[in-house]
Amino acid sequence: MISFIIPTRNNLPYVKTAISSIRKFYLGAEIVLLDDNSTDGTDKWVSETYDPHLTYYKNEGRQVGHTVLYDIGIKMCKHEIFSIFHADMICGPNYVENLLKHLKPEGVISATRIEPPLHPPGKEKIVMDFGMYPGDFKQSEFITFCRDSQENSSNKDVTTRGIFAPWAMYKEDFLKIGGHDSLFSPFPYEDSDIFQRFILAGYNIKQSRDSFVYHFTCRGHRWTEQVQKDDNFYKLCCAKNMNHFIRKWGSWIENDELCYPVIKPFYNIGFVVTNCNLQLLGALEPWCSTISCDCPEWESYIKQVQSGTPFDLKKRVFYRSAEIKNDIIVHFDASQLTQERFTFLTQLPKILLDSGDLGEMKFDIFTFFIKRMPRLESLLIHNNNELYRSRLIEIPVTDEYYTNELFRVFQNTK
């Protein structure tokens, strides 16, 4: 059997619907419900609900997000296979069976999401409106659609290559690479990080085209006040974790048309920049391993930004340093940067993969000195790898997910 891992925060109407949908088809399945200090009566509802196969965990402290709660639930679960399942999802018939028939050790299987027309269409999902909220959910129509689709030869036993929630895998394989990176707490982009690590670890990634969930979308952490309106806390989390992802991987997230991650090379790149100011330093710094610049406010930058990132900026930002020893060094004049040239820098790993050669070369305003080009991304598979940890500051025990600054800024914006 399989364990369902469901994090929640102030999402009780959706949680009730999600658990009810699972119980409709899987009375004995273990459900691990992880409550991120909700104040909506979730704990009271659980205490009044008799379900011998429901395990409940409540975080009584500050919000940690699903990044942390997923891993707590996975470690708690009793079965060797688990499924990440969002609180705003509804389980369809044969959900488990049509995942497990494709799952083997060192594999990750995603189901197919059916969603209302709130986001752009995609080849990895089905856009069909069975309701916007639990109260208007068309359950019988959804179940009929699932069963009819499962009998359709274009879906039955078919898999494609993509990964997204909900997904399932062996607990042992998840723990083998260290689980989610908790420094993406509370959310988002923790999924893209671990998906890339799954692929680099050699795990077989598939999507089952006849395992279905209905997904209301974004109700757990993004649209907490109004559908299709990102709340302010989510926006702050996005800004924090976008920079964290870029500093960690040296590039931004990219997926193909079926939502299979396109992993770019991670090179040891240093920027040597003249005519740099504080604003340009902030824009450029995340996109390289080190930056040497003539910005007179470079120390102020480190002081201002360090509280918001666990990456050690004293190892990343230097003033007119002759000690830059990166594998690849790029010199340029920041006063000549345009949006097009900045975009070129953000795509540099992919460009170097296609056309980089050892030695010195020039392109537009950029001068390259390429000593070597080892790809380092495979060193990021496990959270505790030396390459990653050596680039971080010592994380305080009083701020283990390094979110104090995030919550301070959020409080000041209220």
Task: Mark where each language-model region is.
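Short aromatic/hydrophobic "clamp" motif used to bind/position activated sugar donors
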Residues: 82, 329
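Conserved donor NDP-sugar-binding/catalytic core segment of glycosyltransferases
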Residues: 90-136
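Short, acidic, metal-binding catalytic loop of nucleotide-sugar glycosyltransferases
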Residues: 20-29, 283-289
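A recurrent flexible, glycine/aromatic-enriched loop bordering the glycosyltransferase active site
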Residues: 68, 139, 145-172
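A conserved acidic beta->alpha catalytic loop
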Residues: 35-44, 90, 296-300
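A short, conserved alpha-helix in the catalytic core of glycosyltransferases
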Residues: 161-178, 184-212
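Glycine-rich, basic loop-to-helix element that forms the pyrophosphate-binding segment
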Residues: 60-77
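A conserved hydrophobic helix/loop-capping motif in glycosyltransferases and polysaccharide synthases
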Residues: 2-14, 18, 25-26, 34, ...
